[in-house]
């Protein structure tokens, strides 16, 4: 075990040292085409990841999935699963709801607008999102809707699985992504549940 851990640390160290180092204060430019391709890749990865991982969700807690475990995949599988089990895609449709709010009201839309949009939406929610929906529909608005005193799922991963869209709309702008996370993430999460989302949004950015 110790040897494996040392090898992992060495691999991580070499991979970091091999990355292009950007001097503080310098800028990096990429074309709109490359940026758009990266954003499309992010959305594709998120949607395909939900589909591919769906059948194994909650079945291997505390264990690694055996490499011989068959995982179904065929050309129209993503579309079929979305029709059969749309609740699997809360990662995706919550993000799209938030983007729709920004499209209608601008990127500086208040937290209440994001909260009301998903609270009144006609789709399944789970854990922290569902508890936040209940709170919002009963007059407990953000950030109180995600606070642990009002939301028993405040530490869950709901915002963490939704924060990727924030990074995709804030390319290279980690602080801006964190500002969005502060506003949106506290609608449904608090504490570790919120910090995980801030981290994911920043990594995507």
Regions picked out by a protein language model, each given a short descriptive name:
Residues 1-22:
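Bacterial Sec-dependent N-terminal signal peptides
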Residues 21-205:
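Structured, active/binding-site neighborhoods that engage oxygen-rich ligands
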């Amino acid at each position: 075990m110790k040897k494996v851990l040392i090898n992992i640390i060495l691999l991580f160290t070499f991979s970091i040292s091999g990355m292009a180092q950007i001097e503080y204060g310098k800028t990096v430019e990429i074309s709109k085409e490359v940026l758009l391709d990266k954003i499309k890749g992010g959305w594709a990865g998120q949607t395909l990841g939900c589909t591919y991982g769906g059948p194994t969700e909650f079945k291997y807690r505390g264990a690694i999935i055996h490499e011989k475990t068959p995982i179904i995949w065929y050309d129209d599988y993503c579309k079929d699963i979305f029709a059969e089990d749309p609740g699997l895609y809360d990662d995706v449709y919550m993000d799209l709801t938030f983007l729709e709010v920004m499209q209608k009201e601008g990127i500086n839309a208040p937290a209440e607008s994001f909260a009301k949009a998903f609270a009144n939406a006609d789709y399944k929610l789970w854990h922290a999102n569902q508890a936040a929906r209940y709170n919002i529909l009963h007059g407990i608005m953000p950030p109180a809707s995600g606070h642990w005193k009002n939301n028993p799922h405040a530490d869950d991963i709901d915002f963490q699985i939704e924060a990727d869209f924030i990074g995709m709309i804030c390319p290279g702008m980690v602080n801006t992504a964190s500002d969005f996370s502060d506003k949106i993430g506290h609608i449904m999460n608090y504490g570790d549940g919120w910090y995980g989302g801030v981290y994911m949004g920043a990594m995507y950015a």
